[in-house]
Structures are given as C-alpha cells and as structure tokens.
C-alpha cells in the first residue's frame, strides 16, 4: 500500500499551500470522548466529482436518475484498500435537501462528493505526517510540504454583517406554535425547527475556519472549498463506521454556558433534571437505536454511553452513544442511509417531522442538517452532522440553527436556543453582537 512518510508540518499551513489546487478540503476528527484532534485529512484535485440532485452527474455529465446520494455513491466505490479510517475515497457533503428523495419534491441543493485516491494524513498524537496515494497525485506532496514549512502564519482582517433573516423572534415564535399544534394532534412527538441568518462577509474562508476552531473546539471541524464552501465545527456525528462497528451519538438537550464555574455547574444540573430535556433526549436515543438496528446484526445493538454532558464555547449538550455490528451484506453506505437525516435534526417520527419542517420553515435548509465527511477506501466512514457551520458562496454566507420542539416547549426560549447555537459561527464570521 503506497504510504509515504513526510516531514511534519502544521496542517493549517499545509492546507493553505494546497489551496491553489481545485476542490481542496481539510477534515479534522477527534478521538472518542475527546475534542482534541486525532487525525487531520487534507487533499485536493479529486479524480472525479459526483453531484446528486435531480439525478446523478459525474464531472457534469448525467449518468443516472438516482436522487439518493448514498445509493449513488455506493454504486461508484469500486476500489478497496486494507487499513482503518480515511485512506482515500469520497469526501463531501450530503445536503439536507436530499430528503426530498425520501419524502418527494424537488431537490434544489445537490449533494457533492469528490473522489480523492490521494490524501495527506496528519496524526496529532504522534506528530507524524504521511501521504497516501493509490495513483500518482496531480501535485508533488514533498514540494507542498516544503512550501508549507516556509508559510508565514498571518491573521486576516475583515468582518461580516447580517443582512437578513428568514425568521426573527416573532416569526419563529409563530413557527414553533404551529409545530406544537402538530404535536398536540399526534402527528409527531418532536419536531426540530430552524431559522437562518444571511450574512455579507469579506473574510477569507480559511480565516473563518481558524477562528471557528479556536472559538468552538469540536469533535469534527471541516473546510471544503468546492463550488460552494462549507466551514464548520460540528459537535455531532450522524454516524460512523469503523470495521464492522456502526455508531451514532445522539445529542439532544441544550443549555447555555455559565459565566463562572459555579454557574456552569448549576446550568448543567438544571439541564440534567429538566423533564422536557430528558424526555427529548430519550426519544432521540430510541430513534438512534432504531436507525442502528435497521442495518445491524440482531442482538448486537447496545447503549454504550447515556446522558453525558459535553461542553462547548457557548452551549452545553446531553449526549449518548448507540453501537451495533453491521449485518452481513451491509456496508458504510447502507449505515449512513439508515442514519440520514439525523433524528436530532428532524424529530420523531422522522418522515412526518420532515414533512412538517418543509411546511413550516421559511426557507430551504440547503446543506445545513445534512452531513459532511468521508467514505474511505478501507470501508470505514465518518459523517458529521452539518451544523454549527457557514455555507459560503462568493461574499454571502448563510448560518442556521434549530431547536427541538416538544409539547411543553416555550417558543421564546426555543428562539434564544437558536441564537446561542449560532453565536460561535457568527462570531467567527466577525459579526458584532
């Protein structure tokens, strides 16, 4: 297996050196139970690009009518290598909008993946940098490393301003009340409703990424500079597959951070004793169990963590972990299809919740609420939920957040939850509070 050891270099500088090439990406993932990065994957110049919207295209040419991105990718992954985690393969995003392949309706925001049979792999625990390649890459990895080692770190100036929102406080309170009516009538137990800020920015995408990682260290951080750029620091996996193990970590239940250690602990205690938050979390753990069970061996599904509190820069969340062993004939694409869309971004039951989201939200979700990550040539996969992120096109960015609505939700409180969730991303964009 072609794996070249290279002189170590700061991954941010290496990514910066690679930006002259097409469709660069940087994915950073943490070890289980830690937000400290374990591996960073960096590459560019995919061999081909898959776009799935109202059909599947490869490099701009329509190849099928398949609208489900996970099924489309499954049919295109022909190569396999021995190893673990990411060693080349598909990197990109599944747009939330592709739920219309499940519930009907037009897909307006395509899912996009590049196929990268070459990638830099940086191991944060050892400081080792290596370059995996199935074929000769369209760039010289050693020359890029040398260039990166000479790169000067610099802070970019610039900022952003909010230009509009699809739902201010009054409108969002109305949306939440309408969602609660569907809960009272028995359509759903919970529905996740979101709102968006549109922002004008003159900040470089890599600077936004650097600021966001510093402000909000998270298990998953990413920058993908495709035709659309996505930059994010997500706390939550939609699903991961390592070997034959399929894992979902549902996060549900949110409280703000305290200004002091004592206030923070009080808010954590209140969060864990809040009946509404507990009920919401248990509901979504059950949903994750069902998703994992759909593709796992009978009797292999288990709950390995329950009601842990994880703390981020502006919020703290309750998290659990559901694990199963993939059934015979099932692979990472089947696992992610079972998980998509994440129940923590729709509510339960999923299908009816998605229909209500379509009806009540004031604008389409685009990539937000979908997933960002990789499908490796090793058979492993890791997809973060596309939240705590900015979607950037030219000088315009959109930032979105949602809140889980249940029968006793207080609409005004849910509005402030969306504000708290967006705060770190807006701050990274340079929007003044």
Curated annotation (Swiss-Prot):
What keywords sit in the KW lines? Answer: Amino-acid biosynthesis, Aromatic amino acid biosynthesis, Lyase, Magnesium, Metal-binding, Tryptophan biosynthesis
Its function, per the record, reads: Part of a heterotetrameric complex that catalyzes the two-step biosynthesis of anthranilate, an intermediate in the biosynthesis of L-tryptophan. In the first step, the glutamine-binding beta subunit (TrpG) of anthranilate synthase (AS) provides the glutamine amidotransferase activity which generates ammonia as a substrate that, along with chorismate, is used in the second step, catalyzed by the large alpha subunit of AS (TrpE) to produce anthranilate. In the absence of TrpG, TrpE can synthesize anthranilate directly from chorismate and high concentrations of ammonia.
Quick one: which pathway? Amino-acid biosynthesis; L-tryptophan biosynthesis; L-tryptophan from chorismate: step 1/5
| Gene name per UniProt | trpE
Source organism of the structure: Thermococcus kodakarensis (strain ATCC BAA-918 / JCM 12380 / KOD1) (Pyrococcus kodakaraensis (strain KOD1))
**What does the entry report regarding how activity is regulated?**
Feedback inhibited by tryptophan.
Q: Which InterPro entries match?
A: ADC_synthase, Anth_synth_I-like, Anth_synth_I_N, Anthranilate_synth_I_arc_typ, Chorismate_C
The uppermost taxa in this organism's lineage are: Archaea, Methanobacteriati, Methanobacteriota, Thermococci, Thermococcales
Q: Which cofactor does it need?
A: Mg(2+)
Q: How does this protein assemble? A: Heterotetramer consisting of two non-identical subunits: a beta subunit (TrpG) and a large alpha subunit (TrpE).
* Signal peptide positions (record): none
Which residues are involved in binding L-tryptophan?
A: 29, 219-221
Q: What is the name of this protein?
A: Anthranilate synthase component 1
């Amino acid at each position: 297996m072609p794996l070249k050891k290279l002189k170590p270099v700061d991954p941010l500088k290496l990514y910066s050196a690679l930006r002259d090439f097409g469709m660069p990406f940087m994915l950073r993932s943490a070890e289980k139970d830690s937000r400290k990065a374990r591996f960073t994957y960096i590459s560019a110049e995919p061999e081909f690009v898959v776009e799935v919207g109202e059909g599947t295209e490869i490099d701009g040419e329509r190849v099928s009518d398949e609208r489900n991105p996970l099924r489309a990718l499954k049919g295109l992954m022909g190569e396999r290598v021995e190893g673990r985690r990411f060693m080349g393969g598909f990197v990109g995003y599944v747009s939330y909008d592709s739920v219309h392949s499940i519930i009907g309706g037009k897909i307006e925001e395509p899912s996009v993946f590049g196929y990268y049979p070459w990638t830099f792999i940086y191991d944060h625990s050892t400081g080792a940098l290596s370059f995996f390649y199935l074929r000769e890459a369209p760039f010289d990895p050693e020359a890029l490393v040398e260039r990166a080692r000479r790169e000067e770190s610099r802070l970019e100036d610039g900022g952003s301003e909010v230009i509009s929102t699809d739902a201010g406080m009054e409108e969002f309170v109305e949306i939440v009340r309408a969602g609660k009516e569907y809960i009272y009538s028995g359509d759903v137990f919970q529905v996740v409703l979101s709102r968006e800020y549109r922002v004008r920015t003159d900040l470089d995408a890599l600077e936004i990424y650097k600021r966001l990682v510093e402000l909000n260290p998270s298990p998953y951080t990413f920058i993908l500079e495709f035709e659309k750029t996505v930059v994010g620091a997500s706390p939550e996996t939609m699903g991961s597959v390592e070997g034959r193990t399929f894992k979902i970590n549902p996060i549900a239940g949110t409280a703000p951070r305290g200004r002091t250690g004592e206030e923070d602990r009080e808010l954590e205690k209140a969060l864990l004793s809040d009946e509404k938050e507990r009920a919401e979390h248990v509901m979504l753990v059950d949903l994750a169990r069902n998703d994992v069970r759909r593709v796992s061996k009978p009797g292999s599904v288990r709950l390995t963590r329950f009601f842990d509190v994880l703390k981020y820069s502006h919020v703290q969340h309750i998290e659990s972990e559901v694990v199963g062993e993939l059934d015979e004939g099932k692979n990472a694409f089947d696992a992610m299809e079972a998980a998509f869309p994440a129940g923590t971004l729709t509510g339960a039951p999923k299908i009816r919740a998605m229909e209500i989201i379509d009806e009540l939200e004031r604008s389409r979700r685009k990539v937000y609420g979908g997933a960002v990550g990789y499908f490796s040539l090793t058979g492993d996969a890791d997809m973060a939920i596309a939240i705590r992120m900015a979607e950037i096109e030219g000088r315009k960015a959109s930032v979105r957040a949602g809140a889980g609505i249940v029968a006793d939700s207080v609409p005004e409180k849910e509005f402030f939850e969306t504000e708290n969730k967006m705060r770190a991303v807006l701050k990274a964009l340079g929007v003044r509070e």
